């Protein structure tokens, strides 16, 4: 699923794709109570709730092709118990890819 709006990064036990599809954006807005623009602005500024990080990662995994059950298990094992210094940059990278596009794809086109 390597395209303009997917982010690929090691998470858990291997490299995984993260993508916020339109359906996942709607769900992210619902579970966080913020519109996607407000959530992005807040996360980029470092103003976030832990749950927003976890939901962004979980929904990014689902949008990237992981089943909802597996995404929940991965987040429970590799996001909830980990330091914010590990999970926050991943959540921001997922949202930055949604906002700006994939930096790898941009570099490939240049």
Segments (PLM) and residue ranges:
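Charged interaction scaffolds used for protein-protein
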Residues: 1-11, 15, 30-45, 51, ...
